[in-house]
C-alpha cells in the first residue's frame, strides 16, 4: 500500500480507502463478514475508512466502530457524513432520499451520535452528505463546523456530493469559497466530468479529492456480461439497460490497460484515478474479500504510461467511439 495526504493538509490516507457503504445493508447485494473484512483491510495497509450516519440508519457506523475498536487510533483515519434525518424503519433499504437537515444544531447532534457509534472521540473527516447549494451557503453551519474542530471532535471537514454524478457549482463553491479540506465525488475512467473541474480547483486550494464509484458501479471490474442481472435490492437494478450495454463496449476499448498477472482492469481503473493530480484516494465500496484484495492491489500495480494516459484521454474525448444504446 502507498500513502499520501489531502492536498496541502495534514490529513493522511492510504491511496485505496475502504468504502463501507454496503456493510449492514443489502443495497449492494450480499456482503462478507464486516469484522473480518475490516481486519483484512488493515492487514493490507488500508488506513482510511469512509462511512456515513445515513448508511443503514447508523448501523453502518456501529459495524465500523466495532470492527476498528482494536486498531491503533492514531494509525487509521475515520471519515463520516451528516445531513440526513435518520429513520430506523429504513435500516435495510437505501432507495430514495430522506429529509435533509444542515442546521448547526443537527451537525453537532449528528456528530456526537456518530462518535458514540464509531467508538471514538473524534473523526478525521466530517462531510456534508449530498448538500444542495443552500446548505453550502450557510455561514452558521460552517461556523459550527469550525467550533467542533476547535473542540477536537473533528480534524477536518469536507463535502460528499451526490447522490448522482454532477453538482458542479456546489462542489466548486465548497472548494473555492468554503475552502474545505476534502471533496468526495463520482470519478472514474468512464465518468470524468465534473470531476476534472474539481481536481483543478483542489490543486488551487490545497484540498484533496476522494474518488467514489471508481469502477463505475462495478463495470470496470470486468465481471459483467450483456446478460448480467441484479438482485431485487441491488441499487444497480434501477440503472437503465443502456448503462450496461454501452459500458461493456467502452471497457473493450480500454482492454489495452490490462497487463496479465500485473494489472487487472479493476486495478488499471483505480491506478488511472490515482495518477490524476489532486486525487487524495479512491473509495471503492467493498463487499467481499475478493474485491478487497483486488482493490488494495491497485496501489502497487504498475503505473499507466504516458502513452496509455494519452490514449485514455483521446478515447474519452471521442466518447470511446461507442454509439448511444437504447435505454
Locate the predicted segments by residue.
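N-terminal binding-site loop/beta-alpha segment at the start of enzyme catalytic domains
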Residues: 1-77
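Acidic (Asp/Glu)-rich catalytic clusters
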Residues: 8-10, 67-73, 77, 115-119, ...
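Residues at the N-termini of beta-strands
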Residues: 15, 48, 122-125, 156, ...
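Beta/alpha (TIM)-barrel catalytic core signal, keyed to glycine-rich beta->alpha loops juxtaposed to Asp/Glu
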Residues: 131-325
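Active-site groove signature of glycoside hydrolases
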Residues: 115-134
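Short, acidic/polar
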Residues: 29-41, 102-118, 165-173
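Structural motif corresponding to the early beta-alpha repeats
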Residues: 74-102
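Active-site mouth loops of central-metabolism enzymes
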Residues: 21-32, 93-105, 130, 134, ...
